[in-house]
Amino acid sequence: MADELSEKSVEGTEEDGESAPAEGTTEGVPVDEVAKLRQELEDVKRIADERLEQLLRCRAELDNVIKRNSREREELARFASEAIIKKLLVFLDSLEQAAKHDEGAKALYDQLLDIMRSEGLEPIDAVGKKFDPFVHEAMMQVESQEAEDGIVVQEFQKGYTLHSRVIRTSKVAVAKHG
């Protein structure tokens, strides 16, 4: 049987015109060379994986920058009118005082307030509410038997929010039991 194998292998090499690979080789390439090529392939795959991971992290970071930039632009657009609205609050306060005595001034006050509301301005409700230091500024405490401690009993100046952000606190008097 061993003779048949050696004859076939000799015949195969004679028919192909090629010699059989030498011992310690793979298809005519030395084993050392194959091991070296495999190592290089593994190194290249590892580097490719590292680069892919790096690329994915960069892409995620870019997406985050784009989202943050978009949010900042939206917020800037929302609050671009804040400076002018703050300046108009003084006029709105004066018009509100005049509206208490004059119907024409009341109509103007209502129109201006509607315009400013359409831009996101909202008055802060104060009287009768629990004192909140985020929206109220206590100007004084008033002894009161009717109101509970910490309840706003008087408003000296109206406060406002712009798109739910306080742009001016309400100036108030807060009840305390005496």
From Swiss-Prot:
Residues 1-11 have a biased composition (Basic and acidic residues). It holds the Pfam family GrpE. GO terms for cellular component: cytoplasm. GO terms for biological process: protein folding. It is found in: Cytoplasm. Residues 1-32 are annotated as: Disordered. The keyword Chaperone applies. HAMAP family: GrpE (MF_01151). Participates actively in the response to hyperosmotic and heat shock by preventing the aggregation of stress-denatured proteins, in association with DnaK and GrpE. It is the nucleotide exchange factor for DnaK and may function as a thermosensor. Unfolded proteins bind initially to DnaJ; upon interaction with the DnaJ-bound protein, DnaK hydrolyzes its bound ATP, resulting in the formation of a stable complex. GrpE releases ADP from DnaK; ATP binding to DnaK triggers the release of the substrate protein, thus completing the reaction cycle. This is Protein GrpE. It comes from Methanothrix thermoacetophila (strain DSM 6194 / JCM 14653 / NBRC 101360 / PT).
